[in-house]
Amino acid sequence: MKKIIIPFVLLLLLSFSVQAQDAPSNDSDFNTWQARFRVAAVIPSPGDNLEGADVDISTTVIPEVDFTYFFTKHWAAELILATTKHEVEVEGLDLGHVWLLPPTLNVQYHFYSGDFKPYVGAGVNYTIFYGEDAGDVVGMDYENSVGFSFQAGIDYNLNDKWFLNLDVKQLLLSTDVTVNAGEAVIPVEVDINPLIIGLGIGVKL
């Protein structure tokens, strides 16, 4: 699914950015603060260092909010806030669930092309793991971690204040997990690397 979605979004953004180069500039056509409210699908690409066993992490749909501050017409910083719950399994063994809180700060570059305004961004996230449930084992412990974020999206103006938003982010996220299986304690390096696809509405503050 990712192999289809990512090239499609990149081609769409490229077409809008080419149009943006030819579009007339309006230096007053931005607000210092913006907020977006999205429904987002969080699609992990899990991996681990266990031989002969693959970890499986569930996809989930969540509400997401971000606040964007524009330094100039084109350059901005975006703080993304959301929390998500995932079920975890290894080869059919239920490892319960865990909640993730990954506040993410991206630096963005916004193109301007009439009512369509594509953007790209990159930044960092700090992921906090909480609310662990151990499932069929004695205990699970997830270590908080720092990772990178890459982003592309499009805003479409509905009027001078409100706009629609399509946003795609790739988080490079991994964690050290300690599995207490009762008779043994197993350290595991787990890659989560979620693709986050969001659709919603924004407002210029």
Per-region residue spans from a language model:
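Cleavable N-terminal export/targeting peptides
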Residues: M1-N31
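N-terminal targeting signals for Sec/Tat export/insertion, comprising classic cleavable signal peptides
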Residues: F30-D56
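Outer-membrane beta-barrel translocator domains and adjoining extracellular loop/strand segments
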Residues: P46-A53, E87-L95, Y130-G139, D176-A184
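A charged, solvent-exposed segment within the mature domains of Sec-exported extracytoplasmic proteins
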Residues: G121, G131-L172
